Design a protein with these regions (language model features):
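Conserved N-terminal Rossmann-fold NAD(P) cofactor-binding segment
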Residues: 6, 31-75, 84, 90
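Conserved glycine-rich cofactor-binding loop
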Residues: 15
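Generic hydrophobic/aromatic pocket-lining and core-packing "Φ" positions
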Residues: 23-24, 107
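Conserved S-adenosyl-L-methionine
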Residues: 28-34, 139-142
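C-terminal substrate-binding/catalytic lobe of Rossmann-fold NAD(P)-dependent dehydrogenases
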Residues: 138-143, 152-242
Length: 242
């Protein structure tokens, strides 16, 4: 099986739903065979590792540890979903205090154990803020740390698919701006619908202004909607898009 690279990828928070799905997604996408799973909760972590091994991914070298030093040492790429998840009735910002402390420690661990890491992705909410905190404490360059950014854009695409009843392939360049939270901005300026600018359709019979406002609100509340439906925060979509 040909992988994109053979460099070490460490997944922090691997015993959680996002982390475990990221591990499987990385192997299914053939990103790298060398995956290290880290989580402080050892029993669940071992369970995830066993499941990954039982998948029988060809050429995979899956290791797991509850020692953060061992997990990060030698890592070229790190993805962390190691924060608390949002629950019903919470905003992403409600997670800030606890997850900010986790992000600060994560940044320090990166500085201490893998200062030569190539790239780090921070997934836990509020992702824009926890990513910035990680960056500040890690000493890495801004280009080396990113956060989950594509999910809000795909949520916009999905809402437009449902509204116009056309395939996703006919909706291009969906973009959202600002933080991954309640104050995000949803713009129409770059999006095209079957080759036509979305901005030219807003206010017409095809997309009345009131309908566009409703679509934007659905995008902003996309995560809350998943919690309302499933009783837990999103994990499959952020795991895939990270």
């Amino acid at each position: 099986m040909n992988y994109l690279t053979d460099k070490k990828l460490t997944i922090v928070g691997a015993a959680g739903m996002i982390g475990s799905n990221m591990a499987q997604t990385a192997l299914m996408m053939k990103l790298t065979p060398n995956i290290c799973l880290y989580d402080p909760y050892a029993p669940a972590l071992e369970g995830v590792a066993e499941e990954m091994l039982q998948c029988g991914f060809e050429g995979a070298n899956i290791t797991f540890t509850s020692n953060i030093k061992d997990a990060l040492t030698g890592a070229d790429y790190v993805v962390s979903s190691g924060g608390a998840a949002r629950k019903a009735g919470m905003t992403r910002e409600d997670l800030l205090k606890g997850n900010a402390e986790i992000a600060a420690q994560f940044g320090k661990d990166l500085r201490n154990y893998c200062p030569n890491v190539k790239h780090v992705v921070v997934v836990f909410n509020p992702a824009d803020i926890t990513g910035l905190i990680t960056l500040l404490y890690s000493g890495l360059k801004p280009s080396q740390v990113s956060t989950l950014a594509a999910l809000d854009s795909t949520r916009l695409q999905n809402e437009l698919v449902k509204y116009f009843k056309i395939p996703a392939s006919e909706i291009k360049n969906c973009r959202t701006y600002g933080g991954h939270g309640e104050q995000m901005a949803v713009f129409a300026s770059t999006t095209t619908i079957k080759g036509s600018a979305l901005s030219s359709l807003i206010g017409s019979e095809q997309l009345p202004e009131a309908e566009w406002k409703e679509i934007k609100q659905k995008v902003i509340q996309g995560g809350k909607h998943i919690i309302d439906l499933r009783g837990r925060s999103s994990f499959q979509s952020p795991a895939y898009l990270s």
